[in-house]
Structures are given as structure tokens and as C-alpha cells.
């Protein structure tokens, strides 16, 4: 039995005449022509062929023109059918914000009412204090004072601030506005009085003198407080948990970890919330450096040099200009005086090791001042104080308490 050939022949591609595959973009074509049209129809540079009078399959323009004539259209293109490409972008995992980041406030002031931050601020007038300082500068040092050099004269002037005129010792258990402002005034005037023993200080302009003292009084006070506390421990006036200062005509002793500080006059936050900004704990630099101070036992000459080195270097870096020139010049003179004191009076030519230990104490105080500056920046950002000083130079880098 013979098979009869199929009467129906396969349909041809309407573009190239080859065996067709199916409907593609509106016309029955082969897969090759369908792929060609899919690529060529989206290109702008292909246009009607002007080189061939008859159809040429190898000519892209002719082939594209034949596709259009066969009924193929780019409107039949389908997009975004790729399952991989059609997937949406995977969202990035984000760490959830903390409550502090959400409200924009640090954890230690979260429980405070934000409205209290916008109350009227009180101004502390420093003009009367500056007037007192002007009188001290005009009066000058106690006379007559005869010394071989500047450093020895400063050491003589320091003695009047080391001892209190009265033998009474006052134990301070609470500090409020009255006590804090009293200590502030005493420290500033004592530092001003002491610098009048430096003859070159009198050569500065009056404004420069006051500017210098506004910047360095708290630096002088830090080292002076440390020296008086060390003296108190050696004499048995205070123990290892207390700090002693020479205040007016008497000694004042307090335990920084136990003292009660009333800050309601300068802030609306509680003492617990303000603890970070106050130097009232056993973490204070006084406790950290006290052992080194007791071990070295610097005399008045060495202590005077430490104060000048600490204060003048700080002032030069802060104010620049003529004050910087003055500070560098004085530091050079005082270094020569200290060398002469060690070599000629103490007969100690190899004093480098001892001087390095003294400067180590100064460096520890500088580190503490840097920490205080960072705390002040934080307090300024969050506007925690309700007071302002008429002369802000007084409190830059100074202890809050």
C-alpha cells in the first residue's frame, strides 16, 4: 500500500519565503525574520532602501521594508515579560531608629518637658567683677618685693594664696548660686592678683590684661585647687575623699561625691540629669592627679612655673596675636629662670626627669579641660542652661561647678 503525499504544503514566511513558524508581530514569518524585526524595528538609523530596485534579503533596509509590507508592526512588541527582570527591587534592611534618634534628644533629657527649654534666660553681669580686677591691676603687687628673677617673685606672691589668714576650716555640704558665684569671684581675683607679680604683665594694654585674665583664671584655679588640696592632706586637714580650697580668709573642705549642688538657678533639669556636666565626683581630675602631686611635693617656685606654663600656653593658643607673642616671650624667660633656680640654688643640674613629672601633671589637667570643652559643646547644642554671662569669655572651658 502506497502513502499518498499530503496535499497541504507548509506555509511560507511572507518576508524571506522560507518555511514559516507562526504569527510574529502581526504576520506569518519564520523565527529568523521575527528576531530580525524585533531588533531592527527599534533602530532609528534604518530607513527605506534606495540602493536596490528589487528585494535583497541581505540588505537590512530591504528586509525591514518587506516586514512592514507583510503586516508586522512594532506596536505588537511586548515588554517586561522576563520573570527575572520583572522582579521588584529587594528593599534594603534598615536598622530601626532608637527612641533618642526619633525624638532628637539624648537619653538623659528624655523625661524633660521640651517647653522648659524656651524660657527667658537670666543674664549674669560681670562688669562689677571686672571693675574689681582693674583696681587690683592698677594697685599692682605687694611692695616692696625683691627677687633675683621673675619666677622667684611669682613664688613669693603665691605664698599669700596658699595659706588662709584664719585657721578655721569650713566643711561645705551644699552649694547653690551664692556659693558658686563666691568661689568664681574669689578664684578670678586671686589669679588676677597673682599675675600682677609678673612685671611684664603691667606692660600689656588694659583691655589685653582683662582679656587674658578672663581666659586663664579657671586654668590657674585648677592647679591652685590641686596644690591646696595636696597641702591639706599633708597637714592632715582633709582626707583622701575631700578637696580643700583657700576661700577668702579660710579653708573650705568638701567631698565632691557627697556634696549637694543646687542647680535650679541656672537650669531646668534635675541634678541627676546634669551630673554629666558637673565636675562633682571622685572622677574629678583632683582625685586622679593627687597621688602624683603628693609624691612630687613641688615647692612654690616649681608650682609657680607650672601655673605659668599651663596658663600662658593655653592663653597663647586661644587668643593668638599680641597675647600669643607675650605668652611665648614670658615662657622663654621663665624657663631660663627655672634653669637658673635648679642649677644655682638647688645644685640640681640633672632636673629633666623631675621637670617631666611636673609637666605630666599639667598635661593631665589639659586633658580634663578638653573633656570639659566637649561637655560645653553638648550643653550648647541642647541649650540646657537658663543663664548667660555678659562676658562669655569667662566660662569658656571652665568647670560648670
UniProtKB/Swiss-Prot annotation:
It comes from the Eukaryota. Residues 132-398 form the NR LBD domain. One of its GO terms (molecular function) is DNA-binding transcription factor activity. The keyword Chloroplast does not apply. Keywords: DNA-binding, Metal-binding, Nucleus, Receptor, Transcription, Transcription regulation, Zinc, Zinc-finger. GO terms for cellular component: nucleus. A zinc finger (NR C4-type) spans 13-33, 49-67. Pfam families: Hormone_recep, zf-C4. InterPro entries: C.elegans_Orphan_NR, NHR-like_dom_sf, Nucl_hrmn_rcpt_lig-bd, Znf_hrmn_rcpt, Znf_NHR/GATA. Residues 10-79 bind DNA. Orphan nuclear receptor. This is Nuclear hormone receptor family member nhr-65.
Amino acid at each position: 500500500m502506497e502513502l499518498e503525499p499530503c496535499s497541504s504544503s507548509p506555509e511560507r514566511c511572507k518576508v524571506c519565503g522560507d518555511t514559516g513558524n507562526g504569527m510574529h508581530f502581526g504576520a506569518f514569518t519564520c523565527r529568523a525574520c521575527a528576531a530580525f524585526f524585533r531588533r531592527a524595528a527599534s533602530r532609528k538609523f534604518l530607513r527605506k532602501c534606495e540602493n536596490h530596485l528589487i528585494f535583497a534579503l541581505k540588505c537590512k533596509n530591504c528586509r525591514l521594508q518587506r516586514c512592514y509590507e507583510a503586516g508586522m508592526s512594532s506596536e505588537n512588541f511586548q515588554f517586561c515579560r522576563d520573570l527575572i527582570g520583572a522582579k521588584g527591587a529587594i528593599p534594603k534592611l534598615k536598622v530601626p531608629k532608637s527612641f533618642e534618634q526619633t525624638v532628637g534628644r539624648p537619653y538623659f533629657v528624655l523625661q524633660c518637658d521640651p517647653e522648659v527649654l524656651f524660657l527667658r534666660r537670666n543674664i549674669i553681669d560681670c562688669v562689677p567683677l571686672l571693675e574689681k580686677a582693674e583696681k587690683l591691676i592698677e594697685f599692682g603687687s605687694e611692695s616692696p618685693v625683691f627677687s633675683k628673677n621673675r619666677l622667684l617673685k611669682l613664688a613669693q606672691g603665691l605664698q599669700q594664696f596658699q595659706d588662709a589668714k584664719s585657721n578655721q576650716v569650713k566643711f561645705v555640704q551644699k552649694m547653690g548660686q551664692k556659693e558658686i558665684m563666691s568661689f568664681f569671684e574669689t578664684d578670678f581675683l586671686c589669679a588676677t592678683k597673682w599675675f600682677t607679680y609678673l612685671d611684664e604683665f603691667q606692660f600689656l594694654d588694659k583691655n589685653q590684661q582683662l582679656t587674658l585674665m578672663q581666659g586663664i583664671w579657671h586654668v590657674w584655679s585648677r592647679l591652685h585647687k590641686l596644690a591646696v588640696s595636696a597641702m591639706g592632706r599633708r597637714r592632715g586637714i582633709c582626707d583622701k575623699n575631700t578637696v580643700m580650697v583657700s576661700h577668702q580668709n579660710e579653708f573650705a573642705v568638701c567631698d565632691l561625691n557627697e556634696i549637694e549642688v543646687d542647680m535650679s538657678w541656672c537650669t531646668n533639669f534635675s541634678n541627676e540629669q546634669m551630673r554629666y556636666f558637673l565636675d562633682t565626683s571622685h572622677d574629678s581630675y583632683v582625685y586622679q592627679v593627687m597621688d602624683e602631686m603628693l609624691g612630687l611635693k613641688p615647692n612654690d617656685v616649681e608650682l609657680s612655673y607650672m601655673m605659668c606654663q599651663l596658663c600662658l600656653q593655653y592663653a597663647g593658643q586661644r587668643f593668638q596675636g599680641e597675647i600669643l607673642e607675650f605668652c611665648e616671650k614670658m615662657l622663654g624667660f621663665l624657663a631660663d629662670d627655672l634653669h637658673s633656680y635648679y642649677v644655682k640654688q638647688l645644685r640640681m643640674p640633672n632636673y629633666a626627669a623631675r621637670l617631666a613629672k611636673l609637666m605630666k601633671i599639667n598635661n593631665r589637667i589639659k586633658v580634663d579641660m578638653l573633656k570639659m570643652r566637649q561637655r560645653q559643646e553638648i550643653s550648647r547644642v541642647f541649650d540646657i542652661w537658663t543663664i548667660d554671662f555678659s562676658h562669655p569669655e569667662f566660662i569658656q572651658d571652665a568647670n560648670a561647678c
